[in-house]
Regions:
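Rossmann-like NAD(P) dinucleotide-binding subdomain of oxidoreductase/dehydrogenase enzymes
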Residues: 13-15, 23-177, 305, 373
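Generic, well-ordered alpha-helical scaffold segments in large soluble proteins
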Residues: 13-20, 56, 73, 98, ...
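Conserved residues at the C-terminal ends of beta-strands
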Residues: 20, 56, 115, 135, ...
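Residue-level detector of anion-binding/catalytic polar loops
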Residues: 79, 257-258, 321
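ALDH superfamily catalytic-core signature
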Residues: 103, 125, 131, 139-285, ...
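Conserved C-terminal structural/oligomerization subdomain of aldehyde/semialdehyde dehydrogenase
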Residues: 104, 128-129, 168, 222-226, ...
Length: 398
């Protein structure tokens, strides 16, 4: 099911970039005319492509997180080199075939695959590269940012990095909406989304009731073959993620109270993949590292708070600022939007507390350690990131 959305969103991202270029008439804007005696002047702002743009995409949405930046870069007039994650190269290969079949000339798009430590590093270090978009982990993104900035001049770097995404629940919330939205965001795609809900802060008066409902819904989630539409969780992507889940679970068993999950599945069909149970942990000390660290597996920690101000302080007390959700009274939502430090924010959304992005509806991007550009993918300001401005001033004798 996630793959169906990934492909559909890719098509819409490509259409959206094209529509923004057309709606803005190529981003050529006539400016003021200088008041020069005896002369006529004109000034025009134009946006021009940078040249060669690199797109490095992650495994979790290999179509949309390749096609989105690739499409924007191409529409802006750049040539593109794109390298997928080593776990999911075939999806990007299919995108390359679609571009070929659409008639885009050879050399305008260039699909390459290989390890990030060798091929990826060589691309980043190439002086022929004029800009880069990387979607992935904070640590790798920051290394790319530093390495890419060590050339002869400053080159644009668009980073879409991780998240440690909170949901805040007020005592005035619709608790069923909150429970459904939190579970969907925490465990969709096995928690392997940068937008996954990994932290929940609940006001004390509704804490017990809501936690009970979250656990109840979590226990109903089907785990198995991800091609079966009745299944909600498939396996995590690889052995490293499997080991991460086991290490985090062991830590939580020692330092928190696990209400459900906290173990891998080994019997029967589960022996054929990296299957993990969706995990809810409570009573984790506020200073514990797992409140800060992006886990990227199906684990969510929940805390009781005395009031919304405490919840907001804890929600913002991380290096990340990607997505965030809130459940409460309508009059409380402005407070949430005004104070939360995140690029994509949701209020009273049962479809997902912290997840859900679509071009032209919920453009996707982060603040702080979650993103570098300040402009969200699939939004009205995104395609411009792949161009630089040039001013044309022309003066004629009157």
């Amino acid at each position: 099911m996630e793959a169906l959305g990934d492909v559909a969103e890719t098509a819409d991202l490509l259409r959206y970039s094209c529509s923004r270029m057309e709606a803005n008439e190529g981003f050529a804007i006539e400016l003021g005319r200088d008041p020069l005696t005896g002369f006529e002047s004109s000034n025009v702002s134009v946006l021009r492509p940078y040249g060669v743009w690199v797109v490095i995409s992650p495994f979790n949405f290999p179509a949309a997180l390749t096609g989105g930046p690739l499409g924007a870069a191409l529409v802006a007039g750049n040539t593109v080199v794109f390298k997928p994650a080593t776990d999911t190269p075939w999806t990007s290969r299919l995108i390359a075939e679609c571009l070929r079949d659409a008639g885009i000339p050879d050399g305008v798009y260039n699909f390459v695959t290989g390890p990030g430590s060798t091929l990826g590093q060589a691309i980043i270090e190439s002086p022929q590269v004029d800009g880069i978009t990387f979607t992935g982990s904070y640590d790798v993104g920051m290394k790319i940012y530093r390495d890419f900035g060590s050339g002869r001049w400053v080159r644009p770097t668009i980073l879409e990095l991780g998240g440690k995404n909170p949901a805040i629940v007020s005592r005035h919330a619709n608790l069923e909406d909150a429970a459904v939205g939190i579970v969907r965001s925490a465990f969709g795609l096995q928690g392997q989304k940068c937008s996954a809900c990994s932290r929940v802060f609940i006001e004390e008066p509704v804490y017990d009731q809501l936690v009970g409902r979250i656990v109840e819904l979590t226990n109903k989630l089907a785990i198995g073959d991800p091609t079966d539409r009745q299944v909600y969780l498939g396996p995590v992507v690889n052995k490293n993620s499997y080991r991460d889940y086991q290490q985090f679970s062991e830590d939580l068993h020692q330092n928190s109270r696990i209400l459900t999950g906290g173990k891998v599945l080994l019997d029967g069909m589960y022996s054929k993949g990296y299957f993990c149970t969706p995990t809810i942990a409570v009573d984790l000390p506020a200073g514990h590292k797992l409140w800060q660290q992006e886990m990227f597996v199906p684990i969510t920690t929940i805390a009781k708070v005395k009031n919304l101000d405490e919840a907001m302080v804890r929600a913002n007390n991380v290096e990340y600022g990607l997505t965030a959700g809130f459940y409460g009274a309508p009059e409380e939502t402005d407070w949430f939007f005004d104070n939360i430090q995140a690029g994509v924010t949701y209020a009273n959304r049962p479809q997902g507390a912290t997840t859900g992005a679509w071009p032209g509806f919920q453009p996707f991007g982060g603040w702080k350690g979650s993103g570098s550009s300040g402009k969200n993918s699939g939004g009205p300001h995104y395609v411009q990131l792949y161009m630089h401005e040039q001013i044309h001033t022309l003066v004629r004798h009157a």
